[in-house]
Amino acid sequence: MRNQTKQHLEQLQITMQQLNLWQTMPPAAEAFLSEEPFSIDTMSAEEWLQWVFIPRMQALLESGSALPNKIAISPYIEEAMKEFNELQQLLTPLVALEELXNNNEC
């Protein structure tokens, strides 16, 4: 389960890089202070994936902490990025992560 999660996170990063969604500079420090789900008021969906979701999941993996067993990110990404032509390609690793977590106790 943990190895599969790591692989899906790596695939998400690779996909974001291939789609030119991966950024070299993080958002301003204030953007990370958001209390809204997905930091919707301070970050774009792809920024949130790169700078919040992926690092938090990696930190859980590295520390041996329990992974979330209920994840629902794809509906937000679908709505926030509905105009993005390669949306389905981006959703593939996200849906795989959701299915893995939602079908297993971590």
Swiss-Prot record:
Listed Pfam families: DUF446 (PF04287)
InterPro entries: UCP006257, YqcC-like_dom, YqcC-like_sf
GO biological process: single-species biofilm formation
Domain of life: Bacteria
Family: To the N-terminal of E.carotovora exoenzyme regulation regulon ORF1. The C-terminal part is colinear with YqcB.
The protein's name: Uncharacterized protein HI_1436
Annotated organism of origin: Haemophilus influenzae (strain ATCC 51907 / DSM 11121 / KW20 / Rd)
